[in-house]
Amino acid sequence: MNNPIQKWHDVVKLRDYNTLTEIIHDDAIFYSAVVYTPQKGKDITLKYLIAASEVFNSSSFKYDKEMIGENSASLEFSLTIDDTDINGIDLITWNNDGLITEFKVFIRPLQGVNLIHKMMQGMLESFKNVS
């Protein structure tokens, strides 16, 4: 089974959105920490992941722990935004071809969730204005 996690780390580190496009399945589902409904499809998943990459673009962002299975991984992260310490988990699932089929994000504490919600909303709105 192809494991896309190293490519994912490269995407995060280098903000390499071409590689991101290559590792997301056409029918991927993104589960946001701040949006109730699952976001279905490659295009919307890419928008959320790129927006998150821009919002989280901070020298303090890092993955602290990883648990990697046969076709899924749990990546614990931490960062600081506006003096708010935030941590969370990315749950990533992929298929036999190494394409990410599901991406779930969990964030804490509530102040961090609210801050990221506001920032993500602004970033996603800016994408709409560009399109």
Where are the predicted features?
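Short acidic-aromatic low-complexity motifs
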Residues: 2-23
